[in-house]
C-alpha cells in the first residue's frame, strides 16, 4: 500500500504530526510526503499512490490535490487539524468567497474518510453534515491520551478500511472474469457449464470482499468449491469498509417480492420488475437460476413483459446477464439488447458500492 501525505510546510504543528505519523506507518505501508503544490503534483503523477492523505484544508493546493486525486481514481483521506472548527470556520467564511466555500464543502464531502483529532472536533464537524465517514484519532503530538504507535495503528486501520471499500472498482479484468465463471458454477452446480477460467490467479481478497458486500458470498463459495479453486482463508464478515450513505445490504428476492407462487413466468416477471427498480447483482443471480428452469414458457413470458412495457428493459437485462453471470443465449426468453440504456444498467450495477 502506497500512501502520499500532503501537508502545508508553513504549519509546524501539522508538520510534526505528519513526521510522527509517517515514522509509525513505515512498517505497515510505503509512505511519501509532499509539502507544497509542485511536490504534490509531481508525486501524485509519479507514484500513483493507493491513498492520498491530506492534512488540513485551509490552503487551496490541499483542496486541489484532493480533487486531482479523485479524478485519477485515487482515494483520499482528510485530517482536519481543527481547521473547520466553528470559531475558525466563521473567520474563514468572512474572508473566503462563496465559491471557495462551496469548493471546500464539495471536496471534503468526497473524501473517503475524514479524521478528527478529538471528540469536540468530531461533534462539531458532524453537525455540518458534510461527510458521514468520520473517524476520531487523537493527536499524539499534543496529548498524552495516545502515543505515536497507537496513532499510526489506528490510521492504518482507516487506510485498510478505505482499500476494502467498493473493491469492484479496483478489480482487474482477470478478477471480474473469474467472478463471472465462479457465479456460473455456483448457479448451475456443475463445472461442465463453465467453458474456461482465466489462466492467472485473481485478486482473491477484493473478489471475496465484494461478494460479501453484495451478499453473494454463498454463491461464490459454492462456485469456488464446484471449480476446485484454492482461495485464502478470509472471514469477510469481519472486514470493515465504507459504504454510500443509502447503502443497505442486499436481501434475497423472497424477502423483497415474496415467495414463488407456482407460476414461473409470473415470478420471473416480478423479479424483472424489481430489478428495473433497483438493479442488484444478487437479484441477477437469482433471476438467472429461474431462467434455467424447465417450466419457463419463453413466448408467454415475452407477451407478459410486453404487456408491462418491460420488453426493452428485459432485453438489456439479458445482455448484462450474459456478461455478469454468463447466461447462455439458449436460455434467454428474448434477444439481448446492447445500447446506451444497457450501458446505464451496467453503471448502476457497478456503482452500487461507489462512494
Model feature map: region roles:
Residues 97-113:
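Membrane-proximal helix-turn-helix segments that form the acceptor-binding/catalytic region
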Residues 1-37, 149-153:
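N-terminal subdomain of nucleotide-sugar transferases
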Residues 109-133:
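A short, active-site helix/loop in glycosyltransferases that binds the activated sugar's phosphate group
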Amino acid at each position: 500500500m502506497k500512501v502520499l501525505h500532503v501537508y502545508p510546510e508553513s504549519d509546524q504543528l501539522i508538520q510534526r504530526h505528519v513526521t510522527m505519523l509517517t515514522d509509525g506507518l513505515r512498517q505497515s505501508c510505503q509512505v511519501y510526503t509532499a509539502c507544497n503544490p509542485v511536490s504534490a503534483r509531481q508525486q501524485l503523477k509519479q507514484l500513483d499512490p493507493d491513498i492520498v492523505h491530506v492534512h488540513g484544508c485551509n490552503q487551496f493546493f490541499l483542496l486541489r490535490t484532493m480533487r486531482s486525486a479523485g479524478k485519477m481514481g485515487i482515494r483520499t483521506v482528510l485530517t482536519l487539524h481543527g481547521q473547520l472548527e466553528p470559531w475558525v470556520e466563521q473567520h474563514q467564511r468572512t474572508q473566503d468567497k462563496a465559491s471557495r466555500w462551496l469548493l471546500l464543502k464539495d471536496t471534503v464531502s468526497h473524501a473517503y474518510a475524514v479524521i478528527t483529532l478529538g471528540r469536540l472536533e468530531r461533534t462539531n464537524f458532524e453537525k455540518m453534515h458534510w461527510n458521514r465517514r468520520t473517524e476520531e484519532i487523537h493527536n499524539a503530538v499534543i496529548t498524552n491520551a495516545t502515543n505515536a504507535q497507537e496513532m499510526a495503528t489506528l490510521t492504518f486501520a482507516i487506510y485498510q478500511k478505505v482499500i476494502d471499500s467498493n473493491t469492484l472498482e479496483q478489480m482487474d479484468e482477470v478478477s471480474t472474469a473469474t467472478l463471472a465463471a465462479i457465479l456460473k458454477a455456483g448457479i448451475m452446480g456443475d463445472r461442465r457449464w463453465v467453458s474456461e477460467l482465466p489462466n492467472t490467479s485473481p485478486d482473491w481478497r477484493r473478489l471475496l470482499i465484494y461478494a460479501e458486500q453484495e451478499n453473494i458470498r454463498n454463491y461464490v463459495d459454492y462456485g469456488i468449491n464446484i471449480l476446485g479453486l484454492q482461495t485464502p482463508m478470509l472471514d469477510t464478515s469481519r472486514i470493515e469498509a465504507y459504504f454510500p450513505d443509502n447503502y443497505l445490504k442486499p436481501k434475497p428476492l423472497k424477502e423483497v417480492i415474496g415467495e414463488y407462487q407456482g407460476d414461473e413466468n409470473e415470478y420471473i416477471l416480478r423479479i424483472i420488475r424489481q430489478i428495473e427498480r433497483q438493479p442488484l447483482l444478487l437479484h441477477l443471480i437469482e433471476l438467472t437460476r429461474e431462467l434455467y428452469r424447465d417450466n419457463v414458457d419463453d413466448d408467454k413470458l415475452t407477451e407478459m413483459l410486453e404487456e408491462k412495457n418491460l420488453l426493452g428493459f428485459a432485453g438489456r437485462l439479458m445482455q448484462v446477464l450474459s456478461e455478469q453471470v454468463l447466461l447462455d443465449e439458449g436460455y434467454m426468453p428474448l434477444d439481448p439488447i446492447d445500447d446506451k440504456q444497457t450501458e446505464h444498467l451496467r453503471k448502476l450495477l457497478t456503482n452500487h458500492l461507489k462512494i
